[in-house]
């Protein structure tokens, strides 16, 4: 008997499933375990994990181990199928499918902010509903094209200063 299970974390909370990981955000690191039980001593299982993207009929990766891990970094759905063959047989039995769905990347930036110290819109940063962003780098330029600020942490942003001093109200450009 087998109980194939996927182990992963969302917001540092350990999770597990034996059927679907739905609408997760990239990057998502998942460990797949076959979890065999009640296998007699004369039986030697050979494991085969097949990773297939939705819309394809051929796996993009096959792993031959009882436990395997993969980091999902692209949006879309992937079927992870476990096949098991016994005692050097070439006929593998399909045991289970675990489907992993990664959401499409989403990044929204505000079109204005007011760094006046009132606690409302004081920092120019990505809106909180960002999803599946693997790499982030933003630059702020003044109207003459001079870079005045940049940051790489998607959860931080620009406070409206340059070299420690508040910049003049006006139009600034962001490149993400």
Describe each model-derived feature in a short phrase:
Residues 1-7, 75, 99-109:
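Extracellular interdomain linker/stem segments of modular secreted and single-pass surface proteins
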Residues 19-28, 40, 113-120:
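Short, solvent-exposed loop/linker segments at the N-terminal edge
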Residues 30-33, 47:
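Hydrophobic beta-strand residues of extracellular immunoglobulin-like
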Residues 32-36, 100-176:
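Short loop/turn motifs at secondary-structure boundaries
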Residues 37-53, 134-135:
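Solvent-exposed loop segments of extracellular immunoglobulin-like
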Residues 59-79, 157:
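Solvent-exposed segments in extracellular or luminal domains encompassing
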Residues 81-85, 173-175:
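Extracellular recognition modules
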Residues 85-92:
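Short, solvent-exposed loop/turn segments at the edges of extracellular beta-sandwich modules
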């Amino acid at each position: 008997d087998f109980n194939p299970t996927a182990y992963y974390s969302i917001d540092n909370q350990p999770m597990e499933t034996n059927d679907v990981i739905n609408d997760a955000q990239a990057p998502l690191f998942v460990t797949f375990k076959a979890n065999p039980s009640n296998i007699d001593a004369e039986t030697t299982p050979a494991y085969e994990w097949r990773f297939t993207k939705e819309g394809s009929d051929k796996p993009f990766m096959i792993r031959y181990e009882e436990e395997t891990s993969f980091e999902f970094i692209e949006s879309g759905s992937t079927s992870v199928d476990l096949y098991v063959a016994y005692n050097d047989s070439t006929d593998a039995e399909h045991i289970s499918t675990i489907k992993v769905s990664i959401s499409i990347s989403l990044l929204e930036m505000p079109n204005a902010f007011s760094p006046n110290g009132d606690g409302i819109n004081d920092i120019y940063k990505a809106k909180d509903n960002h999803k599946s962003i693997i790499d982030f780098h933003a630059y702020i330029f003044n109207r003459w094209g001079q870079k005045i600020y940049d940051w790489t942490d998607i959860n931080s942003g620009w406070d409206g200063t340059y070299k420690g001093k508040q910049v003049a109200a006006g139009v600034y450009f962001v490149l993400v």
